[in-house]
Amino acid sequence: MKKISQSIITKRVLWTLFFLFIYCLGNQLVLPFVDLKNANIFGGAIGSLAFSSAMMGGNLRSMSLFSVGLSPWMSAMILWQMFSFSKKMGLKNLPIEIQDRRRMYLALGIAIVQSLAVSLNLPIVSGVNASLAIFMNTILLIAGTFFLVWLSDLNSLFGIGGSIVILMASMMANLPYQIMDSIEKLGIGWNVLLPLILFSLVFLYVSGVVQRARYRISINKINIHNRFKQYSYLDIMLNPAGGMPFMYAMSLVSIPQYVFMLIQFIHPENKWTSGAIKALTVGQPLWLVVYLVMLFVLGLAFAFVNVSGEQISERMRKSGEYIYGVYPGQETSAYINHLVLRLGFIGALYMLFMAGAPMLIILVNPDYLQLSMIPGTFLIFSGMIYNVNEEMKALKLNTSYTPLFENV
């Protein structure tokens, strides 16, 4: 049994490595007709979006097939979740196939806007029809996004981690560059660097502790002996939203900038679009306010997405379980949702303190932008590693049992 389990894990790890190889290969496929020698290729709006793109599996610095990354798909997922809370729209009552199709349509719409905005702001080599180059690059960027979605689905089926692995690879490829670039720009010496390293280690420890912290609710289960009562419980994370709000907030906040970039190209005479793009550029005060508000809202929203009182209550009702002192059904659902609201509020404040507070330094010096985002990146990274580790534990579960007739 142990050999079989190890074989399954090995196969899944090899598949994941293969998918990562394809992802790295795609990052080397440069978009056609782009003037890479242009000094302003990473400047302006494109340069400001490079960091947020890297958080979502993209790489605007490479100007490759995967430059937009999974941002449209991730934005579509969170928007669909928000629409699903509306009972009037009745999205939850639709068949799964229709829901998936409409989510993809939403992702396609966002991908068109983002890809077109990027293509319109790329420097084109001389002697090439600009309209043709923009059209081809837009189509390639959209195709790259949906190829990454397909690759993530394949990794979920055959590998380990799903889309998380793609995002981790993108972050690991860009984080060292961002750190070194900031250190060189700011001229940071070891007298500042050593305290930063120590702070990072403490931050990782705290984030690991919070990631594992649970609130346990005692549950009465049918046909369970009283001596196992202490093991019968429902646990909810202290931070039910996890580290995902940081990444999704980055994705949602970047959408208006893409839209304004598109409007500016269509109507260049409108001066207000330039002001809007500048105000929503990563690191600007307005961007910071919008980002922190979005971070808090998503911290609460993801808590209810990850822990649904209605679903847990329905599952407990069908299995005959109940919470001590709480009636099954609607009362159980309300009890869990109230608890999730409290924990979600604590988690949202934790996100603001750990990932948002360090970014306030950019109001003093915008050059600290990349360094100020490192705590939030670590927060995402620790959550991703935890999820992958839990998946590995589930795959290894069979090794904890021995065959019934092994010694016969």
UniProtKB/Swiss-Prot annotation:
GO biological process: intracellular protein transmembrane transport; protein targeting
GO CC terms: plasma membrane
Chain ranges passing through the membrane: 13-33, 65-85, 105-125, 131-151, 157-177, 186-206, 246-266, 285-305, 344-364, 368-388
Alphabetized InterPro entries for the sequence: SecY/SEC61-alpha, SecY2, SecY_dom_sf
Protein's name according to its UniProt entry: Accessory Sec system protein translocase subunit SecY2
Gene3D superfamilies, A to Z: SecY subunit domain
Organism lineage string: Bacteria, Bacillati, Bacillota, Bacilli, Lactobacillales
UniProt keywords, alphabetically: Cell membrane, Membrane, Protein transport, Translocation, Transmembrane, Transmembrane helix, Transport
HAMAP family: SecY2 (MF_01466)
Top-rank taxon: Bacteria
Organism encoding this protein: Streptococcus salivarius (strain JIM8777)
Summary of the function given for this chain in its UniProt record: Part of the accessory SecA2/SecY2 system specifically required for export of possible cell wall proteins. The central subunit of a protein translocation channel.
Entry's family note: Belongs to the SecY/SEC61-alpha family. SecY2 subfamily.
Subunit organization: Component of the accessory SecA2/SecY2 protein translocase complex required to export cell wall proteins. May form heterotrimers with SecE and SecG subunits.
Keyword Electron transport in annotation: no
Compartments it resides in: Cell membrane
PANTHER family attached to this UniProt entry: SECY/SEC61-ALPHA FAMILY MEMBER
NCBIfam families on file: acc_sec_Y2, PRK12417.1
Cytoplasm among keywords: no
Membrane topology label: Multi-pass membrane protein
